[in-house]
Amino acid sequence: MAKGQSLQDPYLNALRRERIPVSIYLVNGIKLQGQIESFDQFVILLKNTVNQMVYKHAISTVVPARSVSHHNNPQQQQQHSQQTESAAPAAEPQAE
């Protein structure tokens, strides 16, 4: 598997799995919006009111509506969760 695929596939899969709305900008400037239904090495199937097959070579940018966690394996996911929890500030007691 190429290095580019090792980041691309987990990222697209997380967007698909969590059904996160995305904006896909094409190299010609057109903006497409929807949810990623499926993808393979060459295309992304984008679902909105209709399904569109978008060729990856025509895509400039994929912008999710919210942030997404996209780790390649469960160990990375667990490490990320632990780092996020330890970085969260402790709640301060409120004065009565």
Curated annotation (Swiss-Prot):
It comes from the Bacteria. Pfam families: Hfq. PROSITE patterns: SM. Belongs to the Hfq family. Keywords: RNA-binding, Stress response. This is RNA-binding protein Hfq. GO terms for biological process: regulation of DNA-templated transcription; regulation of RNA stability; regulation of translation, ncRNA-mediated. Residues 65-96 are annotated as: Disordered. Coiled coil: none annotated. InterPro entries: Hfq, LSM_dom_sf, Sm. Residues 9-68 form the Sm domain. It comes from Mannheimia succiniciproducens (strain KCTC 0769BP / MBEL55E). Residues 70-96 have a biased composition (Low complexity). RNA chaperone that binds small regulatory RNA (sRNAs) and mRNAs to facilitate mRNA translational regulation in response to envelope stress, environmental stress and changes in metabolite concentrations. Also binds with high specificity to tRNAs. GO terms for cellular component: cytosol. PANTHER family: RNA-BINDING PROTEIN HFQ. Homohexamer. GO terms for molecular function: RNA binding. The gene is hfq.
